[in-house]
Curated annotation (Swiss-Prot):
GO terms for biological process: aerobic respiration; methanogenesis; methanol metabolic process. The gene is fpoH. GO terms for molecular function: Methanosarcina-phenazine hydrogenase activity; NADH dehydrogenase activity; reduced coenzyme F420 dehydrogenase activity. InterPro entries: F420H2_dehydrogenase_H, NADH_UbQ_OxRdtase_su1/FPO, NADH_UbQ_OxRdtase_su1_CS. Component of the F(420)H(2) dehydrogenase (FPO complex) which is part of the energy-conserving F(420)H(2):heterodisulfide oxidoreductase system. The membrane-bound electron transfer system of the complex plays an important role in the metabolism of methylotrophic methanogens when the organisms grow on methanol or methylamines. Catalyzes the oxidation of methanophenazine to dihydromethanophenazine. It shuttles electrons from F(420)H(2), via FAD and iron-sulfur (Fe-S) centers, to methanophenazine (an electron carrier in the membrane). It comes from the Archaea. It is found in: Cell membrane. Signal peptide: none annotated. The keyword Electron transport applies. It comes from Methanosarcina barkeri (strain Fusaro / DSM 804). It is a multi-pass membrane protein. This is F(420)H(2) dehydrogenase subunit H.
Amino acid sequence: MTVVIPEYITPLIPWVRGIVGLVLIGVIFMGAMGAVWLERKLSADIQTRMGPCRVGKYGLLQLVADAIKLFTKEDLKPLNADSLLFNNANIFMLGSVFLMLVALPVGAVFINGVEYPLAVTQMDISVLYIEAVSALSIFGIFMVAYGSNNKYSLLGAFRNFARMVGYEVPLGITVISVAAMTGSLNIVDISTAQGLHWNIFLQPLGCFVFFVSLMADMGRLPFDQNESEEELIAGWITEYCGMRFGLGFFAEYIHMILGSFLVALLFLGGWNVPGFIANNSFFGIIVPTGFLIVKVVFVLMVIIGLRWAVPRFRIDQVVDLSWKKLLPLALLNLVWAVGLGLYLGA
């Protein structure tokens, strides 16, 4: 997709991208806080209890109270911990999600019929870039586990590594399948090309494989073997407390938000609205991004609901599911996607 930009706007592009980047960081942080609240309230509804309701209207200020609690807790460090690894691990975990945000559009606006994606930058290989930098968080997890000098933390990190190695392969194959059918590795082009023909209907098998692999990549139930409380206390994050724990916890929720955006952009049509024609500036700014956010919230609710619907798998079951079930399905979907792409002339 090529957008013709007037010459007088060209010098302002770096400033606009910087402002958009700062705004997106704030929006994603607020979205992660909203995801925490949504999970607690939805989990409470599933379990027929009230959930957060004491601090603020509908418990909305409970997150502020939790943040104050974490800020005021003492920052403890194990006696035999490696200070360099232990203190800097959060940089990799937060850096991973922020690097994803650079190429991930969180919406689009239509001005005079021209589409302007809300992204810091557009890359021709943005899908591969996002998948690559999302894997950097494993370095932070290993730094925490090894630097903590704790057997439970290290075992949790080993489980995380075994899971990620298995599920990154089918995840990558499904991404390539979508790109092959669309004819582009640019996530903006993939979202725009769907129109009314969403990829979830053209590649239902690919959507299933991608979603399951994404759940494993995020470490959500039933794939949270790296921090299963009954076996490993808190897994790789056992020795973290205070804001160190808070930042690691927060990075997981930001990752979940960005993963939901990926599902919506790759398979649910992105910001495309059925029957919507961007001939009005006001609706062209509000409607597409709002529709994408609705899809993201829906995906979040599915992820949260599965936590209470599916039991945790054993680590051997997780590995078998990846290599023996999802990988063949991903390859089958790739053949289907290539054939469909040739038929559609991608």
